[in-house]
Amino acid sequence: AALRMGFQSFVGQEWQLSEPHGLTAPIIMDATVDQQAGYRFVYSLPFSADTLLIEDTHYIDNATLEGDRARQNIRDYAAQQGWRLDRLLREEQGALPITLTGDVAAFWQKHDLPCSGLRAGLFHPTTGYSLPLAVALADRLAQMQTFTSETLHATIQQFASQAWQQQRFFRMLNRMLFLAGPADQRWQVMQRFYGLPEGLIARFYAGKLTLPDRLRILSGKPPVPVLAALQAIMTPHRQQAMQ
C-alpha cells in the first residue's frame, strides 16, 4: 500500500438509562480502563438527564475492532459508573486512519479522477478528522477559474501534496505512538502529551503547531525507550510497521 496506517477504531452506543446518569459534562477521554490491544479510552456524552452516548475507542494496528468485545466493554463501563442501561437507541461503528508513513506520489498515481476527503488523503494525520481540510480545499477550489476533471485533479493533488509535507512532524509522532513500544503501553505517550499546555494541545488538534510547540513536545524524558523511539522515527518500514 502507498500509505501505512494505524487506526482509531470505535464502537459507540446511545443508551436510554433507567435512572439519571448524574453527568454535568462529557467525559472526553477516560483512559483508566484496561488497555487491551492498544491505547484505549471511553468517551461519554450526555444528551439528557437519562440518555448518553458511550463510545469505546482503540488506537490499534488495523481497522477491524471486535464488535462484540467493544459492546461488552461498554456494558462493563456503564456498570462501573453505576449507570443502569435500559434501552439501546442507536449504535455507530467506524475506523479513522492514523498516518504513519507513505509515498504520496504513488498514492496519487492510483487516482485518475478528482477526489477529496479520506480518498485524497486529506485528514488530520493523528485524529483522522477530515472536516478542516475539506473546508480549506473548498476555499482553494473556489479560487479556480476553469473547472474540468483535469484541472480539478491537478489542483486537489497539489493541495494534498502540500498538506502531506506540512504533516511530517505529526507522522513522526504517530510512529512513536504505534511503533516505539508495546501496544498496551501506548497510554504512556498519550499521558505525557495531555500534560502539555492547553494552548499547545489546541494547536495540535488544529494542525497548526509552532516551532516552539514542536520543541516542547520533544523535550524532556521520552515516554518510550530512546532507542525504540529513534528506530520508529528513522526506520518507519521496520517489522512493526503496518502490513
Language-model features, listed with the residues they occupy:
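Predominantly flavin-linked oxidoreductase catalytic cores and closely associated redox partners
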Residues: 1-88, 99-105
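Surface-exposed, flexible loop/turn segments at secondary-structure boundaries
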Residues: 34, 96, 121
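Catalytic cores of enzymes that engage adenine nucleotides and/or redox cofactors via long glycine-rich
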Residues: 91-95, 100, 118
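C-terminal helical "tail/cap" subdomain of flavin- and related membrane-associated enzymes
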Residues: 142-243
